[in-house]
Amino acid sequence: MSRIIGLIGGMSWESTATYYREINELVRTRRGGLASADLLLRSVDFEAIVALQKAGRWDLAEAALAEAASGLVRAGAGCILICTNTMHLVADGVARSIPVPLIHIVDVVGQDLVAAGIRRPLLLATRYTMEQTFYRDRLRARFGLEALVPDADDRGSVHDIIFDELCCGVVKETSRRRYVEVIEAAAARGADAVILGCTEIGLLIHQTDSNLPVFDSTKLHARAAVDFSDGSLQVDAVAA
């Protein structure tokens, strides 16, 4: 089996850059010297994907990502990562279109939450991820977790900061404080951890900003990619 990592990125490229850095830093830490990751990146046009999201054309978005995944497999990728939480709404369809494992970001996050004894994490993400049930349903079905989401006003703030600022590389202290308010409100409702369930949120929020344990989906997904590449990942546990 090929151990080349295949990344579908560009959604946004700000977080794809984090994936690339995290994966290569982990490889260098584990192997030492000048070691770097053997990977392939297919970066899509995020503007086109966002237009499909807004139009509710998830079928066309799935087709676009399936085509990207197939191209990576033809180029030699032994696994596929969709480098965005929101587009895991179509992950099962993409997984069915390829003969190699798709490392599902929700499974990677769920495994770490369970290992840490978390039961009621707060999910911070785009409005699509927070309001549609694919993410929370998978956490519940596979890991017995009951994820909370913010109230409607807070969901709007979280979503707008992602698209208007973080996806454009803009990090504001006022937005950090707004996210902290959302986290504190969720803690008062019984949340026992925070999922950074959009790959850009880690640009803004860190463990030092929260009294609750923070689980950064980007870093966890990147680690799973390296685990796959060095043979330590149980592929069946994360394949869709």
Regions found by a protein language model. Name each.
Residues 1-240:
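Non-catalytic structural scaffold of enzyme domains
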